[in-house]
Design a protein with these regions (language model features):
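A positional/architectural concept
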Residues: 1-7, 11-15
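Glycine-rich hexapeptide-repeat left-handed beta-helix
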Residues: 9, 16-21, 31-32, 37-130
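Short proline/glycine- and basic residue-enriched helix-capping loop/turn segments at helix->loop/beta transitions
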Residues: 28
Length: 130
């Protein structure tokens, strides 16, 4: 799990038989996401609530919408996967649009909010242990 990655409540990450799951730096994995390895998730990605990955590879800066399912597919950088999409192979993702500037800003806002929460937690912990 990369630096400043954000893994939220109720996320399930697992794999079988020694397969690996990697999550890149600054990637946000929202509530209730399921990741079934082997999976490789790049840097600066956003996986919205209840999305699922199964044996998938995501390049950098990908947005996966709520409830989307990606299985046995490789997605290129900056791909936007709409909520509820089902991607069963690479061709299913062809023609999808790129992540917009608005979505990029949202991902950055999430990253900043999570960093503030972490910093506040560390400060309160230091005070409690003093």
């Amino acid at each position: 799990i990369g630096e400043e990655a954000n893994i939220q409540d109720g996320v399930i990450i697992h794999s079988h038989g020694g397969a690996t799951v990697t999550i890149g730096a600054r990637t946000s994995v929202a509530h209730g996401v399921a990741v079934h390895g082997p999976c490789a998730i790049g840097e600066d990605c956003f996986l919205a609530m209840r999305s699922s990955l199964y044996s998938a590879t995501l390049a950098n800066s990908i947005w996966v919408g709520m409830g989307a399912l990606i299985m046995r597919a490789t997605l290129d950088s900056h791909t936007y996967v709409p909520a509820g999409s089902v991607i069963r192979s690479r061709p299913d993702a062809w023609g999808m649009r790129f992540v917009s500037n608005k979505e990029k800003r949202y991902m950055e806002e999430i990253r900043e909010a999570v960093n503030r929460l972490r910093e506040d937690y560390m400060k309160s912990r230091a005070v409690a242990n003093a």
